[in-house]
Amino acid sequence: MEKTFETPGGVRLSVEIHAGLVVVTAGAVDRTVVTLEADNAGAADLVERATVECRPSGSRHVVEVKLPRVYGMRLLRRNAVTVRVEVPERAEIEVATASADLEINGPVGDVDFKTASGNASIDDVAADVTTKTASGSVTIGTVGGDIRASTVSGDLRCSSVAGAAHFSATSGDLELGAAGSRVEVKATSGNVRLGELAAGADVKNVSGNVRVLALGEGQLHVRSVSGDVAVGVVKGVQLHVDVETASGLVHSDIPLRDGPVGGAGRPEARVDLSVRSVSGNVEIGRALEHVA
């Protein structure tokens, strides 16, 4: 099945699918093309009963794709149904699945992805991202706005976010390459790896390790029970340190006293580092020595 809609002025795409694969490609076009593919008889029946509609909403168009739910013995293998959608750049994307995967290529606007066990690979988002998964993993490139992502056991990875970042995970690992605003992380047993932080972070973790590669400005608060904590501080900033661990070890390559970190940098920038741990070790050093 294939349907083409003329959609000048912007698009909001909504896809509901139980199992399968959703591929969204954004480009310099003024139309939206929806293609539904099936590779077996059961999947073909779902495609036949799917609804694909387009309606105007103010100055933009809303394109809705809905496939029937799959129950009991009629569960299909993961990618038996594929939904391919070509949309204009900066289209808003909303996808809800049970186990279907999502792949977004090209620059899009707001993205909202909810799934139980589906995975997501998202390329370039000009606005905000919201993802919620149980066991699915999410990988995101650049985010021009804010990101809010939560998972139970899946991994979360994002290359960079211009705005604020809010992450929540139980046993999945969290990784963020760079953030232009404040970062908030709540984790239980997964590892947390943060790259370049321009405005600090609040990190709470129970047993996973926490690693911050380059803290450049702002306040970093880390609360951990048994996981190790490693922090790299950018040279030249004013550093203020408050570290406590009950039974873990504290090691620092720079003096743990208030004052500038050695080397050229930004003396007007201030970093407040606060770490509390029960049994985890704490390591503090210069940022370049921590970057892998």
Region locations from a protein language model:
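Intrinsically disordered, low-complexity terminal regions
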Residues: 1-292
